[in-house]
Design a protein with these regions (language model features):
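Short, small/acidic-rich helices and loops at N termini and domain boundaries
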Residues: 1-151
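Glycine-biased, small-residue-rich flexible motifs in mid-sequence functional cores and linkers
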Residues: 1-36, 41-44, 132, 141, ...
Length: 380
């Protein structure tokens, strides 16, 4: 994987392709997955402006149509062609905004114009416009599976991120491991919390995740130290006990490209997850996990879940951001109570006191969290 990582990163920074000479094959491509990979690269993950553009497309392959519209602007050789292509692009955005339930005001159109210029600039910096080469580049030479809307492995719950026009669902998901883990359970449980935890929090997260997976349910978390790692290890423990046919899976959601998974102290965990579970990101390979991306990642952890559990959290923990997303999307939110004299539990205690979350009173009796026991829906 190290060699693939370096190769992918370096290729993205080589000399740009010449659009008017080499974009023809890409313009003719009807590969929706490739189009969404490139649109994700252009917009640096999902945002509301790109989603409006996609909603303004009328074809069965909105990603392909949106990419072609951007390429037509990039390839225009005369002022008239440029004006016509930009007008088409803006009309798609305005239509998509209306379909999303809003009116495209002048400031919104201006924001789209600036954003689309950046997107086109990133397209022009691609090292090639050859579809096969781009597909190899953006899948880490085949190391990652790309899942898009319409795929049998696309979690339908992500569409709840579409209910407000200032949110945006991911354009695609990059998966390393078993992509079927994403849809292996109808009502997944997300377990989140602080990185710096005590033994109580670690025990609660691991035991709760193990019990959840022992009943065939999917456990979702963020791959970080502390509560996240404990939750993933708990799900792995369940598989060691019951085997792959019965135990539920675990999915780790990352804030950057899958070639930038961290922390390094969790590498053994990540290797285990890749066997029969899944590492997932909405970002293209080589994307650096900047601080703002962790907050965006939290919305995916909440959206994937039927129930969200905050196992242990301080008042300023990022897990409270995930809890906020969960409440916005009407997920069932639970918090584990702790000592009122310990700052490590203050976030959970506040959620319970403010009636933002239900109190979770047991890690062994999970009936209040999960539906009936089932075998995971996975490929043979």
């Amino acid at each position: 994987m190290t060699a693939l990582t370096h190769q992918t990163t370096s290729q993205l920074h080589t000399a740009p392709a010449q659009p008017t000479l080499s974009a023809k094959a890409l313009l003719q491509s009807d590969d929706e997955a490739l189009a969404r990979m490139l649109l994700t690269h252009c917009s640096e993950c999902a945002n509301a402006l790109m989603t409006s553009l996609l909603k303004g497309c009328d074809s069965e392959h909105p990603g392909v149509e949106a990419l072609r519209a951007l390429l037509m602007v990039a390839c225009a050789t005369t002022e008239q062609e440029q004006r016509r292509a930009r007008n088409t692009l803006e009309c798609m955005f305005i239509l998509g905004t209306a379909r999303w339930g809003r009116k495209a005001r002048s400031e919104g159109v201006a924001s789209f114009q600036l954003a689309s210029q950046r997107w086109i600039g990133r397209l022009l910096q691609l090292p090639t416009f050859d579809p096969d080469a781009l597909c190899a580049l953006f899948t880490g030479q085949g190391a990652y599976t790309v899942v898009i809307p319409g795929s049998p492995y696309w979690p339908e719950s992500l569409e709840d991120l579409d209910v407000r026009s200032d949110w945006a669902p991911p354009l695609a998901l990059w998966v390393q491991g078993d992509a079927t883990a994403l849809t292996s359970c109808d009502r997944p449980v997300s377990i989140v919390g602080s990185r710096g935890v005590n033994e109580y929090g670690r025990h609660v997260a691991r035991n709760l995740a193990c019990q959840t997976a022992l009943n065939g349910h999917l456990v979702v978390s963020g791959g970080a130290m502390g509560i996240d790692a404990a939750a993933h290890w708990g799900a792995l423990e369940a598989m060691n006990q019951l085997g792959a046919k019965v135990a539920g899976r675990t999915v780790a959601i990352f804030a950057g490209g899958l070639d930038h998974c961290g922390p390094t102290t969790n590498m053994r965990l990540f290797e285990q997850i890749c066997t029969r579970h899944a590492r997932v990101s909405e970002c293209t390979p080589s994307t650096i996990p900047e601080p703002r991306r962790f907050l965006l990642r939290n919305r995916l952890i909440a959206a994937l879940a039927y129930s969200v559990v905050v196992a242990q959290a301080r008042l300023r923990s990022g897990a409270l951001n995930t809890a906020g997303w969960a409440n916005e999307m009407n997920r069932r939110l639970f918090a584990v109570p702790g000592e009122i004299t310990t700052p490590a539990h203050a976030g959970c205690n506040r959620l319970i006191a403010d009636q933002q979350a239900s109190l979770l009173s047991s890690t062994s009796d999970i009936e209040q969290l999960c539906h009936e026991t089932h075998a995971p829906s996975i490929r043979p």
